[in-house]
Amino acid sequence: NLMAIDFTDESVYLVVARQKRNELEIIKMASANLPEGVVLNSEIIDPITLKDVISDLMEQHSITAKYAFFALGNTNIIARSVDVAASVQNDEDIEGLVSYELQQYLDIDPTSYVIQFQEQESNSAFPLDEDTRSLMVYAVPKSIVEQYLGLANNLKLTPYVFDLQSNTFEKWLERVQAINNRAKRLTQENVGMVHLSKSFIGVYLYSEGKFVTSNYLNRGYKDILSYADDASLLQKLPAVASDDLDTGLLKHALDEWVADAKNHILNTENFFSGSTGLNIDSFYVFGDQDICWQLAAILKQSMNREFISIDNVDYENVLWEGSAEFNAEFIPATAMLIRRAN
């Protein structure tokens, strides 16, 4: 069995699957809350507690697996577009040029990072000349990679894939056939994936299925939850945002979150537009469905843009077995396995 392990500052998510030819069968899903301070911005602060929580979760749900999949998406990842001469073809030579670029312009020690790069496709708005190759470079701190490898070892799992969430979402987009029972071909649009949680806002932007840029803000909706002290009030957030309800501190927390979210999303889209000459057609919001559809509706109204809260998804060649069923909070973990199946 293949198991994807996804965790935020507040929760851990497990998705177990098996692959049969080109089909991915998702057989088990489980999640648990994490004590405060165990994980911070994707960094493992307390590896013993994290290992214990995951081990208990696996035991409770009778989960067995051999391989572990991880994906990373946080502020410590450096993503930068680098142009190199088309004549440079050898990977070692390219890595040397990329390392020099990072050291010169970002003032980092490249030996402390795991560096990956992939060629970017030219677009009609900003075509490259024939003598230049454009690369998207990712630099991940080695210390974080070692934390994840250590976690897999402590769980007695083989770390099969260590990836970036931006890459896994790219493959996820390819498999989507419908969202909220409406047919979608997301690889034919310019789309934004917006991940909302208690602790962060993650934005990933794609042009016709190809990753362009991402941005991560440590600004979750935790304060909103602390003032929405009952479920009925949580369901009325759009009314709070539009001043139809006077809720004092909740209104203030919501207004601050919306302002920060708007700026974060627009700043990320501005970079996307500067790189491609295009704008995002639709933003797809995912996370805890009890609050995300409310926040998506507020962003749609506030920004006059298309924000769609993901409630269900139909995939190509992805099957749900037993008690496993779609849940938007598990999209990042599911995307890890879909990337492997591709």
Residue locations for each model-derived region?
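Non-catalytic, solvent-exposed interaction/assembly segments
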Residues: 1-101, 105, 146
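Small-residue (GG/TT-enriched) beta-loop-alpha framework at ligand/catalytic clefts
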Residues: 3-6, 11-28, 64, 70, ...
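Phosphate-interacting basic helix/loop segments used at nucleotide- and nucleic-acid interfaces
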Residues: 49-62, 179-189, 268-269
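Short glycine-rich phosphate-binding loop at a beta-alpha junction
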Residues: 63-75, 152, 158-161, 275-288
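Active-site neighborhood for divalent-cation/phosphate handling
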Residues: 72-177, 312-316
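Adenine-nucleotide phosphate-binding core of ATP-dependent small-molecule kinases
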Residues: 223-280, 288
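Glycine-rich phosphate-binding loops at beta-strand->alpha-helix junctions
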Residues: 278-305
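Glycine-rich phosphate-binding/hydrolytic loop that grips phosphoryl groups
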Residues: 310-342
